[in-house]
Amino acid sequence: MATTRLNPSCHFPASTRLSCESYLGLRTTGRISYARTLTAPRGYLAVKANGGQASVVTAAAITEKQQKKYPGESKGFVEEMRFVAMRLHTKDQAREGEKESRSPEEGPVAKWEPTVEGYLHFLVDSKLVYDTLEGIIDGSNFPTYAGFKNTGLERAESLRKDLEWFKEQGYEIPEPMAPGKTYSEYLKDLAENDPQAFICHFYNIYFAHSAGGQMIGTKVSKKILDNKELEFYKWDGQLSQLLQNVRQKLNKVAEWWTREEKSHCLEETEKSFKFSGEILRLILS
């Protein structure tokens, strides 16, 4: 019997399993299957004719070989995001980086000439971004976002304390500049209209800060703050465990995405780097 495969564009609710009984009225002389990628890791439905009576069987055991393997895919979607992000680093920033340095902030931090004023602009714009990101998560009932409340990676309150410390030292705290404002508005739009892209920024903002961001903070502090350790670079609890907890949650969320949605998320990485790079550049202003 000939087999016809249909890949519908609609999405079935992630929280509800398909009911075979609802399809008992179908009549067909062929075999219809929904691609596994729609609701991975679940199977798909098979509908076939049987002596003039339509019947439905759950073909959970039937799997389809993926046509393309993505780097890191076997370890979970977070590893896919990490792989893409590392490739976007410069060769000076990471061993896996593929880009050449084109501006001072893309080169070795040891060669930077930061200023306190520029660093304050960086901290203020960073706080606006974290305020926005964490406000979206805290105020959302959308399951994809709600699971990331109180992860321990939040930075807005730590930045508030740091800016208060600078104020006590006699520094004037500036207003947010264009890089932070633009990124903040962009995140708000993504949160409403593009959850996969929003999750990409969520991952890159927090994970980049926990690694390269922490290293930058240490070296900049040594140059201009007499080794003062800011709250921005401190976490309550073991950072590695906090990150692992979030990795697990991200992987779980991505299990319900189609391959197309995962690829869309990965494609957003370059924009995340662009926005973050513009804010980082403020340190040298």
From Swiss-Prot:
Q: Name one GO biological process term.
A: heme oxidation
Record-linked InterPro entries: Haem_Oase, Haem_Oase-like, Haem_Oase-like_multi-hlx, Haem_Oase_decyc_pln
Organism, per UniProt?
A: Arabidopsis thaliana (Mouse-ear cress)
Q: Does the keyword Protein biosynthesis apply?
A: no
Q: What is this protein called?
A: Heme oxygenase 3, chloroplastic
Q: Which SUPFAM superfamilies match?
A: Heme oxygenase-like
Keywords attached to this entry: Chloroplast, Heme, Iron, Metal-binding, Oxidoreductase, Photosynthesis, Plastid, Transit peptide
Give the region (Disordered) as residue ranges: 89-109
Annotated Pfam families: Heme_oxygenase (PF01126)
> Keyword Ribonucleoprotein: yes or no?
no
Catalytic activity line of the entry: heme b + 3 reduced [NADPH--hemoprotein reductase] + 3 O2 = biliverdin IXalpha + CO + Fe(2+) + 3 oxidized [NADPH--hemoprotein reductase] + 3 H2O + H(+)
Q: Where is the transit peptide?
A: 1-58
Q: Where in the cell is it found?
A: Plastid, Chloroplast
Lineage: superkingdom: Eukaryota
The free-text function statement in the UniProt record for this protein reads: Catalyzes the opening of the heme ring to form the open-chain tetrapyrrole biliverdin IX with the release of iron and carbon monoxide (CO). Produces specifically the biliverdin IX-alpha isomer. Plays a minor role in phytochrome assembly and photomorphogenesis.
Where along the chain is heme b bound? Answer: H89
- Please give the family membership noted in the entry: Belongs to the heme oxygenase family.
What pH-dependence text does the entry carry? Optimum pH is 7.0.
Q: Identify a single GO molecular function assigned to this protein.
A: heme oxygenase (decyclizing) activity
Phenotype upon knockout is:
No visible phenotype under normal growth conditions.
